[in-house]
Amino acid sequence: EVTKPETINYRTLKPEMDGLFCERIFGPAKDWECHCGKYKRVRHRGIVCERCGVEVTESRVRRHRMGYIKLAAPVAHVWYLKGIPSYISILLDMPLRDVEQIVYFNSYVVLSPGNAETLSYKQLLSEDQWLEIEDQIYSEDSTLQGVEVGIGAEALLRLLADINLEQEAETLREEITTAKGQKRAKLIKRLRVIDNFIATGSK
């Protein structure tokens, strides 16, 4: 677990232990060499140094291990948000502008409209609109039930988790057969992204 905000020691130019680039967590910075230098060269492959706790392996494992970190709170990766095309926007079938409003905490998004007739799934709400609805929910004579609203990357994570990829792909294939022009191109683009997720087993 990363417990310190430090990155690299400015004197030794080595990653700080328990910091953001820690060799004990992510692997050695140099091929076949532990942090303290007790083990060097390929013949010590697979050994975990008893002094510094770093596994003697190739430094390229750092790239892989840094891609699988558990964060205290969800974050939206800028490549998938702002890249062209925006994969998050395509997957959620929402305009990029709306997705950005949620990520940057400018708008709330409806995760479940419950029994509220004025709300719909994925609808964006301003802070004032949400406060108004919240007042209605908590009033004594309220009939509103099951209304769920979110904001930030946590809300996006919930929306993405709600997607059944196989079912969505099947629906898109059916829609593509009857769609024409720009709408058809948009559906194909979305299907391609979903198929890639299914093929790689990504969730």
Swiss-Prot record:
The keyword NADP does not apply. One of its GO terms (cellular component) is DNA-directed RNA polymerase complex. Transmembrane segments: none annotated. It catalyses: RNA(n) + a ribonucleoside 5'-triphosphate = RNA(n+1) + diphosphate. Gene3D superfamilies: RNA polymerase II, clamp domain. It comes from Fischerella muscicola. Binds 1 Zn(2+) ion per subunit. Belongs to the RNA polymerase beta' chain family. RpoC1 subfamily. One of its GO terms (molecular function) is DNA binding. Its EC number is 2.7.7.6. Its cofactor is Zn(2+). Signal peptide: none annotated. The keyword Cytoplasm does not apply. InterPro entries: DNA-dir_RpoC_beta_prime, RNA_pol_Rpb1_1, RNA_pol_Rpb1_clamp_domain. In cyanobacteria the RNAP catalytic core is composed of 2 alpha, 1 beta, 1 beta', 1 gamma and 1 omega subunit. When a sigma factor is associated with the core the holoenzyme is formed, which can initiate transcription. This is DNA-directed RNA polymerase subunit gamma. SUPFAM superfamilies: beta and beta-prime subunits of DNA dependent RNA-polymerase. Keywords: DNA-directed RNA polymerase, Metal-binding, Nucleotidyltransferase, Transcription, Transferase, Zinc. Zn(2+) binds at residues 34, 36, 49, 52. DNA-dependent RNA polymerase catalyzes the transcription of DNA into RNA using the four ribonucleoside triphosphates as substrates. GO terms for biological process: DNA-templated transcription. It holds the Pfam family RNA_pol_Rpb1_1.
